[in-house]
Swiss-Prot record:
The organism of origin for this protein: Porphyromonas gingivalis (strain ATCC BAA-308 / W83)
Keyword Transport among record annotations: no
Function text: Together with its co-chaperonin GroES, plays an essential role in assisting protein folding. The GroEL-GroES system forms a nano-cage that allows encapsulation of the non-native substrate proteins and provides a physical environment optimized to promote and accelerate protein folding.
Annotated EC: 5.6.1.7
UniProt keywords, alphabetically: ATP-binding, Chaperone, Cytoplasm, Isomerase, Nucleotide-binding
Family: Belongs to the chaperonin (HSP60) family.
GO molecular function: ATP binding; ATP-dependent protein folding chaperone; isomerase activity; unfolded protein binding
GO cellular component: cytoplasm
Disulfide bond residue pairs: none
Pfam family, one: Cpn60_TCP1
Keyword presence, Cytoplasm: yes
Name the UniProt record assigns to this protein: Chaperonin GroEL
Binding site for ATP: 29-32, 50, 86-90, 415, 495
Length: 545
């Protein structure tokens, strides 16, 4: 396919049109008075959102050169979302500002490479200043609530629910977001270890009202293969029956014949038993079975380690205070595992989380860590309609990410104030030449933009508010929700330092690449000729039988 090539100013101007198209759509969502953006969907109802990255992901422009510009800024939003989970709109605004002012200077003859060096120098100084301003969150759940509330566009209910979930599962715990059946948003905590496998047969149920198997102080048999014939496990079954305690079997699968025998004995009342399939797949299944064994003080019966089911003994079985099994999940509460063994396993999983490069693997490892360490909290998001549900779920996920970021690197005053305070770090900073110093000035101007936009979205005059915030010091800033200048820390208008840092770093990175671009190549549009008209003389064919 033929290519179209653009150089110099022409290429950069087209890219900038794309940047502006995307940034202008995204930036209206910023702040507590941010506006909604409605996204059309091919199927189903439109999606209403205030989430910057959701808006950015929808934008595709017709002109391939403009579209490249939009995709560059989309990359800023996506990367910021991946790194910090929030701050996508702020990053987009910063990128647009650095690119816009930078481009004017390049047009006026500034050296793009020197500008980039100046921009990088300024960003480094601002990041250091932000780190110095950050205040640790620690176990201050009020701060956690404030951060979550701000990120959820001022929704106090979401803020308090996330703080409650954090309080219950601690830092190691996992918090997942799911859609609720009703209209209420609630948080539920699963104590102990839960995995997503239910009973193999409903005939194991002991509580028919709830359709659950409930076991008190059961033995737990963990086997990593399929149980084909019951004869293999008869010795261990007989020993368990003699104790009078229930038995939970966790195995890869159970053959229908062996299952039928277990069910018949369960219905007769001679066996208190339940069988579930092992969680996970492949190597992850082996690791999860090992986790269960460590948590319950049992041993995984595996031929790989030389253990056979027919030779299993009672000391290979795990135990727990309580086990609940429904059709979808199995929950093991207060496993009788050795505390040191569990601590050692937790350390091992943490090391694997540090070393993994796959986001999916990291997520699964964190789930395993939570199940061993802190438990799992589920936030059920309820709403009156599907459209509202999606919008609310976006906000809950943003708030959750922001909260985690705050715990990691602390908090700074919100509402764009942290950037205004960081201007002080650039006051005496000079580059090695005039263009580098211009690069520093570009960043100094750009970091005012988030506050200007928050103010503009609230219907006020940006320049006036920015000047007044500059005149104050420390945590003094503008609360756009209440239209009041005040100490932002005391009123809970705070942002995670990590989000503030990552947004600027990613924006500057893409802007630097943009300013040093000299040539853009895209596929040439092919003009498809119109289909030829039907030849005449075909009209009489209607009469054919």
């Amino acid at each position: 396919m033929a290519k179209e090539i653009k150089f110099d100013m022409e290429s950069r101007d087209l890219l900038k049109k794309g940047v502006d198209a995307l940034a202008n759509a995204v930036k209206v969502t910023l702040g507590p008075k941010g506006r909604n953006v409605i996204l059309s969907k091919t199927y189903g109802a439109p999606h209403i959102t205030k989430d910057g990255v959701s808006v950015a992901k929808e934008i595709e422009l017709e002109c391939p050169f403009e579209n490249m510009g939009a995709q560059l800024v989309k990359e800023v939003a996506s990367k910021t979302n991946d790194d910090a989970g929030d701050g996508t709109t702020t990053a987009t605004i910063l990128a647009q500002s650095i690119i816009g002012v930078g481009l004017k200077n390049v047009t006026a003859g500034a050296n793009p490479m020197d500008l980039k060096r100046g921009i990088d120098k300024a960003v480094k100084a601002v990041v250091t200043h932000i780190a110095g301003m950050a205040k640790e969150v620690g176990d201050d759940f009020q701060k956690i609530e404030h951060v979550a509330k701000i990120s959820a566009n001022g929704d106090e209910n979401i803020g308090s629910l996330i703080a409650e979930a954090m309080r219950k599962v601690k830092k190691e715990g996992v918090i997942t977001v799911e859609e609720a059946k009703g209209t209420d948003t609630t948080v539920e905590v699963v104590e102990g270890m839960q995995f997503d496998r239910g009973y193999i047969s409903p005939y194991f149920v002991t509580n028919t009202d709830k359709m659950e198997v409930q076991m008190e102080n059961p033995f737990i048999l963990i086997y990593d293969k399929k149980i084909s014939v019951l004869k293999e496990m008869l010795p261990i079954l007989e020993q368990t029956v003699q104790t009078g305690k229930p038995l939970l079997i966790i195995a890869e699968d159970i053959d229908s014949e062996a299952l039928a025998t277990l069910v018949v004995n369960r219905l007769r009342g001679s066996l208190k038993i339940c069988a579930v399939k092992a969680p996970g797949f492949g190597d992850r299944r082996k690791a999860m079975l090992e986790d269960i064994a460590i948590l319950t003080g049992g041993t995984v019966i595996s031929e790989e380690t030389g253990l056979k089911l027919e030779n299993a003994t009672m000391d290979m079985l795990g135990t727990a205070e309580k086990v609940t099994v429904d059709k979808d999940n199995t929950t093991i509460v207060n496993g009788a595992g050795n505390k040191e063994g569990i601590a050692s396993r937790i350390t091992q999983i943490k090391a694997q989380i540090e070393n993994t490069t796959s986001d999916y693997d990291r997520e699964k490892l964190q789930e395993r860590l939570a199940k061993l360490a802190g438990g799992v909290a589920v936030l059920y998001v309820g709403a009156a309609s599907e459209v509202e549900m999606k919008e609310k779920k976006d906000r809950v996920e943003d708030a959750l990410s922001a909260t985690r970021a705050a715990i990691e690197e602390g908090t700074v005053p919100g509402g764009g104030t942290a950037y205004i305070r960081a201007i002080a770090a650039l006051e005496g900073l000079k580059g090695e030449n005039e263009d580098e110093t211009t690069g520093i000035e570009i960043v100094k101007r750009a970091i005012e933009e988030p506050l200007r936009q928050i103010v503009a979205n609230a219907g006020k005059e940006g320049a006036v508010v920015v000047q007044k915030v500059k005149e104050g010091k420390d945590d003094f800033g503008y609360n756009a929700r209440t239209d009041v200048f005040e100490n932002l820390y005391t009123t809970g208008v705070i942002d995670p330092a990590k989000v503030t840092r990552v947004a600027l770093e990613n924006a500057a990175s893409i802007a630097g690449m943009f300013l040093t671009t000299e040539c853009v190549i895209a596929d040439k549009k092919e003009d498809n000729p119109a289909a030829p008209a039907m030849p005449g003389g075909m009209g009489g064919m209607g009469g054919m039988m």
